[in-house]
Structures are given as structure tokens and as C-alpha cells.
């Protein structure tokens, strides 16, 4: 597992992972940054997909990003008023990596899913995601540290 200090949108990987909402409306946080960087086509394709449950993942084009795909992993359901649990984050990370396998992708970049707007503690997120990532040694994964708290959480994984 690699560490990148900066936005997930900077990565040259096969897929970047988006901390989405279940409605796939990319209006804030990392989701909005991905659409700004990759273009409106990401939101348009997400609109056609329409929905993704917590703990699941769906792929869309990456527009003009360096990646080939954006894999959307919901961390919040505004309609139902629920935020992702650590189990949802673990299952969503696994679902994203299963999609990587299905699409024959060799690399993926992840923000700390749920550690931003959703407010799940970054250290707990990093640990849940690392557990899932360890199950997919065939996909080279990069965790992105966007904030000081993210950086501390990801670097804490080295102590495991």
C-alpha cells in the first residue's frame, strides 16, 4: 500500500475512488472535487446509474482525470439520514476492489472514505480500509492523505 500526500484527483492510477452519497450527487467534499477535476461527464454518468447502497460500489468514466475510472463508494445516505458505519466502509472498500478485479484494473487510489464530511474518525477509517485492501494483493492501492488527521491516521497503519 502506498501513501500519497494530496488530493486523490492527482493520482495516475487505473481508478480513483470517490466518497459518494447513495444518490450519486457529487455536490460536496471529495465528490465535488472529482467532478471539478474530471468534468461534468462524471456527474452525468452517475445520474444515469442513479443509486448505490452503502457498502457497495459502482464505476463511471473518469472524464479528463488521469485515471480510467471513478469508483463511487457511498458513505452517506441523505435520503435515509444514515451515515456509513465502519462495516459499510470496509464492505465499500472491498466492493471497490472487486470492481477493480472485474474491470482488470491493477491500481486504485482511495481517499479515507467517510473521514471528511461524514465525520468518521480517520484512524478507524484507515484501519477498516486497510483490512479490506489486504485481501486484494493483486491491486496496487494508494491511500491519500488530504489533511493532517488523514496523514496521521495513514501513517499509524505502519505501526500495525
Question: Residue ranges of each PLM-predicted region?
Answer:
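Phosphate/ribose-phosphate-bearing ligand recognition and processing surfaces
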Residues: 77-160
Amino acid at each position: 500500500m502506498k501513501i500519497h500526500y494530496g488530493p486523490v484527483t492527482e493520482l495516475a492510477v487505473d481508478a480513483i475512488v470517490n466518497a459518494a452519497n447513495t444518490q450519486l450527487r457529487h455536490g460536496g467534499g471529495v465528490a465535488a472535487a472529482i467532478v471539478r477535476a474530471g468534468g461534468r461527464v462524471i456527474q452525468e454518468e452517475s445520474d444515469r446509474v442513479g443509486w448505490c447502497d452503502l457498502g457497495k460500489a459502482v464505476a463511471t468514466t473518469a472524464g479528463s482525470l488521469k485515471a480510467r475510472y471513478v469508483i463511487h463508494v457511498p458513505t452517506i445516505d441523505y435520503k435515509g439520514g444514515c451515515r456509513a458505519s465502519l462495516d459499510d466502509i470496509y464492505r465499500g472498500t472491498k466492493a471497490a476492489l472487486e470492481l477493480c478485479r472485474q474491470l482488470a484494473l491493477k491500481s486504485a487510489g482511495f481517499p479515507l472514505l467517510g473521514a471528511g464530511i461524514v465525520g468518521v474518525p480517520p484512524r478507524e477509517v484507515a484501519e477498516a480500509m486497510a483490512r479490506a485492501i489486504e485481501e486484494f494483493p493483486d491491486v496496487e492501492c494508494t491511500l491519500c492523505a488530504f489533511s493532517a488527521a488523514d496523514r496521521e491516521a495513514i501513517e499509524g497503519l505502519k505501526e500495525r
